Structure formats: structure tokens, C-alpha cells
């Protein structure tokens, strides 16, 4: 009986850290959000506000907030090679962990006329847990070892 309980605990731990399915809503280099932000929208009202700040007057993509939530990472103003990519979302302990890769490039005189503001916005299954954002510094093909390579962790309040 004790072995069965231990096996169930191990399965529950592994399941809790399984990657959440994510779907990209938008990704690019032309956001109107020109400061670095990590955002979570759990309601349609919050999502509309984020989308309007990001894209202006265009309509926000539809999201079913009874099932899903939106996570966005905005890189702020950057040089011509700047980019953002959300590489994974997992449940770990009592929080949702969003891992993303950020490529920064300096603004030089030539690139100041064409500001790059990279972003990545995804939809994931809704969770009420706090969300933590982690910048991943590992190479793209080494995400399995993410714990060794996480550089920065930030917590985002769940009041969104």
C-alpha cells in the first residue's frame, strides 16, 4: 500500500510539471508596447486592454476565458536583431512558470529610426495560480535542462 502511495505521489509530481499546451496568438517585432512587460490576462476586459495597448485599434483575437488565459512577453525597444520567444509554460509547485528566450541587440544610430519592439503572446489553459516568468539562457535545443540555465525569475500578481 505504501509503495502505491509513493508511486502516486511521483506521478502527481511529474504531471504537475508537464508542459501546458500553448497556442501562439501573435508574435512579431512591431508592438506599440515599447517597455519590457510580462503580462497575464485572465479576463476579456484585461485582454482587450493589453491588446489595445499593443496593437492599437485592431480587434483582439477571441479567447474563451472560461477555459484559457493569455500570457504575453513584450521585450521593449531594441535593435534590429531583438526578439522574444515563449518556449514553455509549466505548472511547478503552486505556480505557473513561463519560460522565454530574449535576444537583445543594441540600438545604434541607424536603427533608431526603425524601432523594433518584439513580443510573443500565447494562450494556455486557465490557472488561478500565481505566474512566474523566467528568462531562459540555454541554447534552443537544450530546454530539457532548463533548471540549470534559468537566469532571471520574476513573479506576476494574479490580480489580472
Regions found by a protein language model. Give the residues of each.
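Positively charged n-region of N-terminal signal peptides that target proteins for export
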Residues: 1-3
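Hydrophobic h-region of N-terminal signal peptides that target proteins for export
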Residues: 6-17
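Exposed, flexible binding/inhibitory loops of compact, secreted disulfide-stabilized domains
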Residues: 16-160
Amino acid at each position: 500500500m505504501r509503495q502505491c502511495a509513493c508511486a502516486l505521489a511521483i506521478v502527481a509530481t511529474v504531471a504537475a510539471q508537464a508542459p501546458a499546451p500553448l497556442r501562439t496568438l501573435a508574435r512579431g517585432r512591431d508592438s506599440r508596447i515599447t517597455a519590457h512587460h510580462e503580462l497575464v490576462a485572465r479576463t476579456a476586459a484585461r485582454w482587450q486592454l493589453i491588446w489595445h495597448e499593443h496593437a492599437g485599434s485592431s480587434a483582439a483575437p477571441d479567447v474563451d476565458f472560461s477555459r484559457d488565459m493569455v500570457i504575453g512577453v513584450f521585450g521593449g525597444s531594441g535593435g534590429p536583431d531583438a526578439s522574444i520567444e515563449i518556449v514553455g509554460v509549466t505548472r511547478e509547485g503552486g505556480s505557473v512558470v513561463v519560460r522565454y528566450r530574449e535576444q537583445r541587440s543594441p540600438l545604434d544610430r541607424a536603427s533608431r529610426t526603425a524601432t523594433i519592439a518584439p513580443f510573443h503572446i500565447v494562450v494556455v489553459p486557465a490557472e488561478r495560480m500565481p505566474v512566474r516568468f523566467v528568462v531562459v539562457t540555454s541554447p534552443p535545443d537544450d530546454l530539457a535542462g532548463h533548471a540549470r540555465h534559468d537566469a532571471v525569475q520574476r513573479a506576476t500578481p494574479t490580480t489580472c
